[in-house]
Amino acid sequence: MKNIYNLFRIASRIRSQRLKLLGIYFLHMTRQRYLGVFIDPILACNFRCRMCYFSDGEKRKTLKGSLAFQDIEAISKSLYHRALKLQIGCGAEPTLYKDLYKVVALGKQYKVPYISLTTNGNILTYESLYKLVATGLDELTLS
């Protein structure tokens, strides 16, 4: 995964938006992977951290629901073949999603080279960690 971070480093040094767009166009035309897909399969959290928007009762009322697995399959069909990285959990708690293992497996099915999960880790067990890694998780970030 060192190559992914090298690409990110190179892209951050390029100042010209036109040159970046040309690079993306080149990657697209040569059928390379260039997207970072960030997904929150569920809008819920089991913590109420002060710095987080889930601690605000009014805001939390608007943050409800989860994606049906069929919706995630539709997203994956459209984007995963171009994804360089799949980030699961961008602000909510992905371990509350009942089909989390299927989401990771779906990323591997589409050969996404790097799959990362960000979680507070509260409900993770040894068995769930083992299953996530066995399904194809590359990185686990505890926040």
PLM features: what roles do these ranges have?
Residues 2-140:
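Conserved alpha-helical substructure of the radical SAM core
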